[in-house]
Amino acid sequence: MKDKIPVIGTGTLTDESVLPSMGDEALGVISPLHYSAALDNPQNKEFVKKYRAKYGKIPSYYSETCYTAMRLVHQAVTSLKGDVSKADRILSALQSVTLKETPRGPIKFDSYGNPIQNIYIRKVERVGGELQNTVIYTFPEVSQFWKYKPEEYLKRPLYTRG
C-alpha cells in the first residue's frame, strides 16, 4: 500500500532508536522532527561519531535532545557565574541562550520560552547498509507560531472538539 500512498508520521515514528528493528517496512516513511542523525553539519557528524564509538549505535532524537538541553543549561549557568540561587534569574538566563552550532542546528528561544529551531522533513532510506532519516527539506527557524505573528495567533480561539 505504501507504494501508492506515502506513509507520513510523527518524528518519533522513525526515530533512530527504533529504525533498526523496523527493517525495510520503514523505507519511504516521511516524518518531521528537529533532528536526524543524518544531518550534514560538522557538529552532528562529530556527535554521531563519538556517540557511535561509545555506545555502538547511532544517536536518537532522545540522545541529541538531552545533549543539547545540557548545553543550554551549561551556557545559562555559566552566564550567571554559577549563581543559581534565584529561579527568575535562571529562567531569564535560559531564555537568552542562543546556540548557533549544535547537532540539530541553531536553537534559541522566543519570548514565551519555546524553542526556535529548524524542522527537518525526513525520509527513511537505506544508506551504506543502514536505515537513516535522510533530510529532504528544511524549514528554518520554526517557532511555535509557525509563520504567524504571535500577537495575532494568540488572539485566536482555543482549539476544542466540541
Task: Say what each PLM segment does.
Residues 1-162:
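Extracytosolic ligand-binding ectodomains
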